[in-house]
Amino acid sequence: MPVPAPLTGVVPPVCTPLTPDREVDVPSLLRLVDHLVDGGVNGLFVLGSSSEAAYLTDRHRRLVVESVVGHVSGQLPVLAGAIDMTTPRVLDHVRYVTEAGADAVVATAPFYTRTHPAEVARHYRLIAAHSPVPVFAYDLPVAVHSKLGTELVLELAAEGVLAGLKDSSGDEGGFRAVVTGARAHPGISGFSVLTGSELVVDSALAMGADGAVPGLANVDPHGYVRLYRLCREGDWERARAEQERLCSLFGMVRVGDAGRMGGSSSALGAFKAALHLRGIIACPATAEPQVPLSPEEIEGVGKFLAGAGLL
């Protein structure tokens, strides 16, 4: 379905369930999609960080998009990551995901190669010129090692190059500058500013953000939808209480032993363990070479679920 302008609400970055031999587990993926739709989300973002897009082969990426788009059948917009190191590779992904039915594409700045802001701007202009669907920028400096500047984002928004921004930078001052700048700019309309944080959704919405793309919404979509609704209703006391409950639940991402695994292994392993414990996916496997959680660490995830009333 066409992406609303602006896109608002809760748009989970959908986890990619895998089989024990690391193929895409399509039945589990579709159960997860049903879980999210039943939770009342406003859109789905596949092939992002929580989707383990960086680990998926091109064949797997296309299968994910085709499966999700076919299953939702236009009920919700499906945004698909077209994330790769350089512009030519991203343009290939744009073609593949849009042929598979994606309603919008999401792209980071180029990475691995050393780039200049002028080249980042050219990157997005080329993507928009070749994409038949709207383009969202994904600000993820922890992974791509460059920050999308406020002036650049607003310039590209005013040109119509970008339909929105998913901000996972952790820079709340910069996020506020984009929110207020987009609102004040006479040449910008329908531009969506989305926080990628699980922990400050209430404050992001209070400052004027359009919605959120929280990975934890895979586990508890109802909670984030409830939080969004409370914020929109101006019930800030109950919204704060719901945000605090979700912050406590988010503690699961730290169950993994930092001495033997990276942060992504711990966080994504926790999300998948939670989905497995809740009976939504068949296997909690993460993509190689991520280190799996131990039985004791998975038990710890279960305690977080129980504490949040989800198990």
Say what each PLM segment does:
Residues 11-15, 39, 209, 220-311:
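C-terminal alpha-helical cap/extension of soluble enzyme domains
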Residues 12, 46, 51-54, 84, ...:
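Short, flexible micro-motifs
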Residues 129-130, 141-255:
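Catalytic alpha/beta core domains of metabolic enzymes, predominantly
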Residues 39, 63, 67-72, 96, ...:
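Alpha-helical structural signal in soluble globular domains
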Residues 26-33, 150, 295-305:
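Short, amphipathic alpha-helical "lid/cap" segments that border enzyme active or binding sites
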Residues 56-59, 117-120, 148-150, 177-178, ...:
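Short secondary-structure transition/capping segments
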Residues 2-147, 290-291, 311:
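Active-site beta->alpha loop and helix N-cap motifs at the rims of alpha/beta catalytic domains
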Residues 29, 61, 65, 90, ...:
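A general structural signal for well-ordered alpha-helical segments in protein cores
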